[in-house]
Amino acid sequence: MEFSLLYIHTAILGLISLFLILHFVFWRLKSAKGGSAKNSLPPEAGGAWPIIGHLHLLSGSKLLHITLGSLADKCGPAFIIRLGVRQALVVSDWELAKELFTANDVAISSRPKLLAFESMSYDFAMFGFSPYGAYWRELRKLISVELLSTRRLELLKHIRVSETEISVKELYNLWKDKKNGSGHVLVEMKQWFGDLNLNVILRMVAGKRYFGTIDAKDQEEARRCQKAMSGFFHFTGLFLVADGFPFLRWMDLGGYEKKIKASAKEMDLIAEEWLQEHRRKRESGDVASEQDFMDLMLSLLEDVDLPGYDPDTITKATCINLILGGADTNTVMLTWTLSLLMNHPHILRKAQEELDIQVGKERRVNESDIANLEYLHAIVKETLRLYPASRLGGPREFSEDCTLGGYHVTKGTSLILNLWKLQRDPRIWSNPSEFRPERFLTTHKDLDVKGRYFELIPFGAGRRSCPGTAFGLQMLPFVLANLLHAFDISTDEKTDMTESPGLTTSKATPLDVLISPRLSPNLY
């Protein structure tokens, strides 16, 4: 998660400074008392200011994972930062990560109750933001067994296959219509990846297809959906004044709570329209032979009683969560993968050579081909190592006192796992900042990304690991293989790798590439 420090006006600070100081002193005395009879506390990073702690370090132009990585070089693999009256433990070491996800997995399976999380997730009804407990366990089981199981993904395989075929054909038609004198067309690939992934996940979850249609209603709904999704990722990627100082929430400094609630309401309106449409079809008997996730949720919740929320809220929250996670993460990862290939054309050529050997140029890539593309899988793994979609993993909170690496960690401490730093450990990876897929065919060929090897955990690990890992590991190589097999892709200049802040770390600038077909016209 990226934190953005929102300014506090000097006048307001003057009015509340005395109260803040008293609260700060009380918190420090309480923290000192809590650790006095325990193991030693983790070191605190230097540079903290009175009252606000380290918030000033997190508000500059440097991205948070890089700032925290620099602090780890000074403070060690585990250290504390203070965010107002909150404190967070920053971990940057795979051995400590292993201890976290084995000995302390239950204790770190909850989420901090941040303002944006509360407002955007139906008061924590979304499984991605729910605190650890009976509700989360039952919902996670339902999602894993009924929605994202291997069997369910196999049943819906034709969706990702057909949408990929359609998107490749649209790219080819664009080339036919707009190619330049040298036989290339310039394409912005972030948008292409985004439209493809959103179509796939929307069809799976809500039976919708927004992009590539001429229906004006669908296009308007698509714009609303994209705007609402953009708002979700913007606001959940912020650390607000009210998060660092909960007792100031009533002031709504900067009007952010009002904006967050407006964005959440728009997302809910869209989900409510989907829900009512599905309910009308069920009541009229017009149920499709292929049920999407919303159909399944409506059926499943007739027989399951989840505590704390009504069935409609659970259905909407779960479907939105699946759409947001599935579309955004895959788009971010495909964008970074292609960006890396543009800056390493020799690796791109090797990937295409493998495709020509395993698939040939007389047909298109089938899903059955993917298992044979070892070098392509190595490219995906290396991208996930260097550019995990969420550089700091999902934010967590200790629900009980713990011991980690000999340090005492108090209940209520937030956990920040710096995957960006952890997965570039020079003790594990030679030349850790270099893009070298070959390492996954030689020295690290036995490592996977499913949370079993703590040197490489881009999807997290333990109880709170990403439930969509299997889906992501199907989409990423399949889309990439089809794209590289169908087109020659290049750039006139080096691709900009600037990252943007947020809950997921996307490419800050467009990904403009030149494409031309490499197969016979009848194959598109």
From Swiss-Prot:
One of its GO terms (cellular component) is membrane. It is a single-pass membrane protein. InterPro entries: Cyt_P450, Cyt_P450_CS, Cyt_P450_E_grp-I, Cyt_P450_sf, Plant_Cytochrome_P450_Monoox. It holds the Pfam family p450. It catalyses: strychnine + reduced [NADPH--hemoprotein reductase] + O2 = 10-hydroxystrychnine + oxidized [NADPH--hemoprotein reductase] + H2O + H(+). It comes from the Eukaryota. It is an enzyme of class 1 (oxidoreductase). Gene3D superfamilies: Cytochrome P450. Belongs to the cytochrome P450 family. This is Strychnine-10-hydroxylase. It comes from Strychnos nux-vomica (Poison nut). The lineage of its organism: Eukaryota, Viridiplantae, Streptophyta, Embryophyta, Tracheophyta.
